């Protein structure tokens, strides 16, 4: 059945007050849904342009009927209420959003309003600070006497989410202000974001881990910051630009531009492109220049923000509704195009995640030919009511991953059928079930090792650079040897020496197949030669030699190579610190399984306002402390009591739940891993789940019979770089980047990917770029590769 296109909105000139009231109610509900999707779920359902169009309609109706403006209107609110699971934080000064301009005329009108409000003479032109509008997550940082005490998301503008623990892992955010006389109290604000390159690398890790890719850098930054597991946030390459403030006990500067300088001196990163403009022409020239450079910037922006420079004028201008009169956002037009959706392909990752990919008729979007686009997940497809054959609007989300943002329903073919997400794995036919614990409700194949797609992805991961790193054992070999039945699990790779004839035959068949395809395509017959036979023999010998070279492997690479969900390179290295060898590792995971928290404990933990402090008190009581509190039982505060009553129903059930939770608290073996900031509860549970699967344990046992696992050499306490943070930049000539990193870690250093005020050393090779400039900015010691070789003993 063909869906009906949306009815065009009534023209404002003919819109009656009664109809306006109904439309405002509908628009308010629709905008609220999209606010929740964007701010709480980090999963927007519509494009920025579509969202702005909804808001513009509300503003236009309210301008005609000002008596219909209500306190719950979208024009009077910002963002969305804080999500459940985080403590609420009241902003001392509200974090309001900005009004938007979409044309040069609207920017000029903004400045005219400013001059009119301030009653400035014609020759008095207010200076304007122009800054790139970073597409990230707004954050407020509260400092008291120079120390970071709290970090909160914007939330609804008045109340945000407490993300202090997660924010402390972001290198760009100082824990103490680097100024001689810090204010008694201040709220400093800015944007958490992710570099495009880091986003692409993160998505590659997601794909390697068999997880769905993130939609764009903004969503991945927001989702990373709002993780309940701090270890996950710490593993994500988040960055922060400071650009504003809320409460401030004593402002040290009189202008916006001057305050940006103070923020830099205090230890924050301030966007270097920010410019002080003396006229509207200067501001618009900046906008055009940034627009031209947008594609080459290392981070995503969606416009330019203009702010009146003088702070006394900002104070006089004040606010109108949800936005300041002294600032406005000049938005970029979205890079979009329409094309035909030819089909949807389901890709199966290493952990069984089913990820939909749109196959499109080729179309150019922002100068790039797009044939594939992300559809995120099952719920996203349903929300857009996607049919195969639809005409769809494609947008380069975040200038990186193309995505389908809407359907042109009036162009839908009569025979188009709605897309049904598969309930069975397309690779093995096993049931595919929704994992409701995932933020995006991912559907996963239950086939495990019998699923060829998962098995092939796991084998690819096993031989990859960060794992066993078997040279030459690429994607082609993995697929070929799996299809030929020669390699079905990692241990089979090391048994290929006993199957040399079968291996040669498999390679011969593959080459013959490719040659036949070439002959059919070109019409030219291939001549067999001795050189081809020799090449085939050499390929086999080289492959077997590369395999032999990896029969001894570092402990952390062994763990990472197993492809355990949520156990990446950082977590693998952390696990090595806890266990002496593989046997101790397996025994430790088994002990953690026996010590894992029970359902009653987990249920209590998920009750609102029952946080880590409460859980720790329960643990103390569980330990049998002979105190009055132990005899009387744990006493929640009023807020916790109300939440417990809402969750359990009555006092008797609360008492029973507390008693049950105490008996099901996690034991030391579980806590040892879960409390490590680089492991965390999620990875600990994944380890338990992995080794409780008999097939997985058998694979590991078989692998241990084939390889020797060696523990990394202990870090030298006497090393001159022990405990220091080191960053490598530029092209290294003596060693590879991975080798240099391994040497630094062996000597007790921590290797970081970016330079901050906390960095101790930067090793700069030829063609060093922004990291070298950052080192000079922060006063970090810079070493040449020769100097590094000398202090690391790698001459």
UniProtKB/Swiss-Prot annotation:
Its EC number is 6.5.1.2. GO terms for cellular component: cytosol. Disulfide bonds: none annotated. Signal peptide: none annotated. Pfam families: BRCT (PF00533), DNA_ligase_aden (PF01653), DNA_ligase_OB (PF03120), DNA_ligase_ZBD (PF03119), HHH_2 (PF12826). The keyword DNA-binding does not apply. HAMAP family: DNA_ligase_A. NCBIfam families: dnlj (TIGR00575), PRK07956.1 (NF005932). DNA ligase that catalyzes the formation of phosphodiester linkages between 5'-phosphoryl and 3'-hydroxyl groups in double-stranded DNA using NAD as a coenzyme and as the energy source for the reaction. It is essential for DNA replication and repair of damaged DNA. This is DNA ligase. It comes from Rhodopseudomonas palustris (strain BisB18). The lineage of its organism: Bacteria, Pseudomonadati, Pseudomonadota, Alphaproteobacteria, Hyphomicrobiales.
